[in-house]
C-alpha cells in the first residue's frame, strides 16, 4: 500500500506547476494572488479537479502564499487573512461539488495547519478564526510540527468531535531556516 499526498497543493495542482504555467498571456494569470488574480487561480484549481478529481484523492483545500509564506503577507491583518481564506475555501468547495462530487461529505479533503495558516484557524481574542467554520465541515485538519519534531498544536477537548478528524504532518527532512536536517540518507 502506498499513500502519497501533496500537503499544500490545493485542488490537485502544484505550486511548481503554476510557476511554469503563469504569465502575462496565461489563462491562469501571472500572480499567485486570489485577490488580484481570482479568475486565473480559480481556473487553475478547476483544471486540476477536472484532470484528477475522478481519481481517489485527498484534496487539499486552503491557500498559502508562494514559497511557504502567509497568504496576504505580514502587512495584512489577521481578519483580512481569515476573510480571504474563507473566500478561498468557499470557492474550492464549490469547485469540488461541481467537478468531483456534489456531496462534499463523500470527498476526502484536508487543510494543513502550517505555521502560516494556524493563526487563521484559531484567530485571537478579537478576531474569530476558522475553527468551527462550516466550510471546514468534513475536512481533515492536518496538524503540523515545528520543524523540530514537536507538534505545534493539539485539538482541544471541544475540537475532538470535528467531523473531518485530524492528521499529522511530520518532517522526515527539512531544508530551510532555522536549520536543515535529514533523517534518512
Give the ranges of each region predicted by the language model:
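Short acidic, gly/pro-rich beta-turn/loop elements at beta-sheet edges
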Residues: 9, 13-20, 71, 121, ...
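Intrinsically disordered, low-complexity regions enriched in small/polar residues
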Residues: 20-22, 30, 116, 122-124, ...
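Gly/Pro-rich turn-and-neighbor structural signature
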Residues: 37-163
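Glycine- and acidic
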Residues: 26-30, 66-78, 172-184
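Structural detector of well-ordered beta-strand residues that form the stable sheet scaffold
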Residues: 2-6, 110, 140-142, 167-169
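Hydrophobic or amphipathic alpha-helical targeting/insertion segments
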Residues: 1-50
